[in-house]
Amino acid sequence: FDTILVLNFTGAKEFKIFESFLRNKHFNSKIEGDISFIKNFFFNLNFDVNQISLRKLLFRFLPENETPVVLNSGISKKINGTIKISMKHSQSFIGRINDLNMVLVFENGDLRIKNGSAKLPHDSTIEFDLLFADNSNSPFLDFSLNFYSQNTKKFLRKFNIYRSVDKETSLSAKGKINLRSNKIKFFSIVSDKSEKFDKQDVLKIEKNFNQNVLNTGILGATDFFKLKKFANELLN
């Protein structure tokens, strides 16, 4: 896991970072921003990502069938600041993803991902907010997702789903994943802005997701074949 970090900066206790970069076999990014050591360690950085192998990078820190390092040690409460991440494009199991943007907020041991957004294939978009917190040694991931597609039929074909659907579809979901038990709990699922899923449907989706996606850990949420199986059992 060889990593090259080059920092060019000016300043003493407050540093201005410029023309810097972080590179390894999974990640390549330009870096600029500010770092301060006055009173406490604080940073405000911009990462302009040129290349990323997200799933491989996640496997480094969240290996399947092992207790993830982050769950053993947590995130230091001394790490506070923000990292704005932008990426023009990346390849994924559903095709090319464009204009990926998000803000990582580190605050007293919690990690929040705010204002996440990306353009997906077939005129589809996703917006997301995430919160990772270690609450009394019970780490969890809160999530809020908003998906919209102007060509739902073509998008679903990526998952070998050929059922008749409306051309335009929206779906919003909020919930929590227990990172110890690898179980998901949905607070709400709403389709096409107003149709809220009833309790029985939500329980069915939770059971399906836990059995087919999270059965080997949180990284199942990035596994195309697991997501494909989940979607097929749910929609076919």
Question: Where do the PLM segments sit?
Answer:
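Membrane-proximal interfacial segments on either side of biological membranes
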Residues: 1-236
